[in-house]
Design a protein with these regions (language model features):
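Helix-loop-helix units of permease transmembrane domains in multi-pass membrane transporters
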Residues: 70-103
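Secretory targeting signals
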Residues: 26-64, 69, 96-162, 172, ...
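Terminal transmembrane helical anchor/hairpin motif
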Residues: 32-47, 169, 173-251
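Alpha-helical transmembrane segments
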Residues: 15-26, 108-109, 231-232
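Transmembrane alpha-helical segments in integral membrane proteins
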Residues: 62-76, 80-81, 151-167, 228-246
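Membrane-interfacial segments
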Residues: 36-40, 73-76, 80, 116, ...
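Membrane-helix interface segments
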Residues: 13-14, 90-92, 133, 164-169
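Aromatic- and glycine-rich beta-strand/loop motifs that create alpha-glucan
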Residues: 1-22, 245-250
Length: 251
């Protein structure tokens, strides 16, 4: 089944979509790195990470929705769903394999990006890879990965339940906008909005001190990792129990 998924994914340009997402992330990373005050910034890693997370807040839902749409859409062509079901394969198993493949691609992309972030942060003399920083890196790496996987699962559910061909892409844009809105309006809503979770792990807080703003580090947010894992578990349970699917769509 794994080899079959790889064969089906050929020609879908999944890697091209991931490359575009990487280019967007790289742009945000380099913007933070190239600022005039970066070399003297007290929190170089946090500075780059926050730029990376802020851009991910809007673009990741759209990119991940596009990836999910591509791998589901291929099944709708040439009656692939019916063919595989007739061979004894369950729709749930096919979906889980697709989710695994996309999650691995996102995981590999994220490893490369985070290594690059750490490498660039190390260019600042204030960067010190102490226990607290290592803990923050590990927790937020896992949190970011969990958020991405939870969105893959959510878009898979939307794609398999929706009858409209472009609904999931429209939903991803609305979701991305909702993430930005909740970031600007409510910490509580950001914490429960699956598309606003990136905003809850921003590292730097700006506090007004007279006429200037000073930077302080936020405490590590462990709750977001827990919430994203809950979304993953609930989505997997939902997919496993699905008994009605939309295997073709209206334009």
């Amino acid at each position: 089944m794994k080899n079959l998924e790889i064969k089906k994914n050929k020609g879908l340009k999944l890697n091209f979509t991931i490359l575009i997402l990487f280019a967007i992330h790289l742009f945000s990373i380099l913007i933070a790195f190239k600022t005039k005050d970066f070399q003297v910034n007290e929190y170089p890693l946090a500075r780059i990470l926050d730029s990376y997370l802020a851009i991910s807040l809007f673009f990741n839902p759209i990119a991940l929705s596009s990836l999910v749409k591509k791998v589901i859409e291929i099944e709708e062509k040439n009656n692939m769903w019916q063919m595989q079901i007739s061979l004894g394969l369950k729709v749930q198993k096919i979906l889980i394999d697709k989710i695994k493949n996309l999650s691995i691609k996102v995981f590999l992309l994220q490893i490369f990006e985070w290594l690059l972030i750490i490498f660039l942060a190390n260019k600042n003399t204030n960067f010190d890879l102490d226990v607290e920083i290592i803990k923050r890196i590990i927790i937020y790496f896992l949190t970011t990965l969990s958020i991405n996987i939870s969105m893959i699962l959510i878009f898979t559910i939307i794609e398999i339940k929706s009858k409209k061909i472009y609904f999931s892409l429209f939903f991803s844009i609305v979701g991305a906008m909702s993430g930005i809105i909740t970031m600007l309006t409510s910490k509580v809503l950001s914490q429960i909005n699956p598309f606003g979770l990136f905003a809850t792990i921003l590292n730097i807080n700006y506090v007004k001190d007279g006429q200037v703003y000073t930077q302080t580090m936020n405490n590590i947010n462990y709750l977001t990792l827990l919430i994203s894992l809950i979304y993953i578990i609930l989505s997997l349970i939902y997919i496993a129990r699905l008994n009605k699917f939309t295997l073709s769509k209206d334009i």
